[in-house]
Amino acid sequence: MSESPYKAGTTHFGFRDVAAKDKQKLVGQVFTSVARNYDLMNDLMSLGVHRAWKRYYVATAQVKPGDRVLDLAGGTGDIAALLKERVGAEGSVVLGDINAGMLSVGRDRLTNRGLVLGLDYVQCNAEALPFLDNSFDLVTIAFGLRNVTDKDAGLREMYRVLKVGGQARVLEFSEVTADWFKPIYDFHSFKILPKLGKLFANDSDSYQYLAESIRKHPPQDELKAMMGQAGFERCHYKNLTGGIVSIHSGYKL
């Protein structure tokens, strides 16, 4: 495994090399730009399949009524809403996001759906979470880890705030496993997606970054190893839709 570019003082922002200290601001600008069209963005990036991926992700999580759950990079709240159904009236979900605009959209959408009790919203950096050790039964992050500057630090923080016996889950765009599909996927990502972003959201640059960020994200086996290095045990992953996305799971034992 190559040395983390973060440790060298630089990291990637899409295909660009930038100072690690600047990535958080740059990513923040992207998500402030796309916050109101975030679900549209995911529809364009996944051709609408992200909704099924998210339902499966939550349905297969280790969570039960009464549990306390942390959903990082919670965005517009769709994962948090599904998790709240699983933990029930006695359970609680904390929706955490570093971006105030995304957090506001999530709060408004869930409130408009009548989802108020047992939901909290915290603006936080995944690399330095403002929670006590052993606070949550389940920690999730969906389509957010690739935007974290120091992914190793983010994984260590997920481990720290997880209760013993708890599970961490990562849903993320990943490395396509079928060679024949890779050229098609690249064409959609780099030729079609930015144009759709320009057409529907008047923002091609943000969509270009998001496509590039997927290619820079660690492939499945590397992310599994990173989770193990962060302290998680029984780490494994499951590819969905030919590896377009994968679900990584690990436990604090």
From Swiss-Prot:
Listed InterPro entries: SAM-dependent_MTases_sf (IPR029063), UbiE/COQ5_MeTrFase (IPR004033), UbiE/COQ5_MeTrFase_CS (IPR023576)
An example Gene Ontology molecular-function term: 2-methoxy-6-polyprenyl-1,4-benzoquinol methyltransferase activity
Pathway: Quinol/quinone metabolism; menaquinone biosynthesis; menaquinol from 1,4-dihydroxy-2-naphthoate: step 2/2; Cofactor biosynthesis; ubiquinone biosynthesis
Methyltransferase as UniProt keyword: yes
Designated gene of the protein: ubiE
Keywords, ordered alphabetically: Menaquinone biosynthesis, Methyltransferase, S-adenosyl-L-methionine, Transferase, Ubiquinone biosynthesis
Organism ancestry: Bacteria, Pseudomonadati, Pseudomonadota, Gammaproteobacteria, Lysobacterales
Pfam family, one: Ubie_methyltran
One GO process term, biological-process aspect: aerobic respiration
Record: residues binding S-adenosyl-L-methionine: 76, 97, 125-126
Superkingdom of the source species: Bacteria
Role this protein plays: Methyltransferase required for the conversion of demethylmenaquinol (DMKH2) to menaquinol (MKH2) and the conversion of 2-polyprenyl-6-methoxy-1,4-benzoquinol (DDMQH2) to 2-polyprenyl-3-methyl-6-methoxy-1,4-benzoquinol (DMQH2).
EC number assigned by the record: 2.1.1.163, 2.1.1.201
Statement: the UniProt record of this protein carries the keyword Ligase: no
Reactions listed under catalytic activity: a 2-demethylmenaquinol + S-adenosyl-L-methionine = a menaquinol + S-adenosyl-L-homocysteine + H(+); a 2-methoxy-6-(all-trans-polyprenyl)benzene-1,4-diol + S-adenosyl-L-methionine = a 5-methoxy-2-methyl-3-(all-trans-polyprenyl)benzene-1,4-diol + S-adenosyl-L-homocysteine + H(+)
Similarity remark: Belongs to the class I-like SAM-binding methyltransferase superfamily. MenG/UbiE family.
This protein's name: Ubiquinone/menaquinone biosynthesis C-methyltransferase UbiE
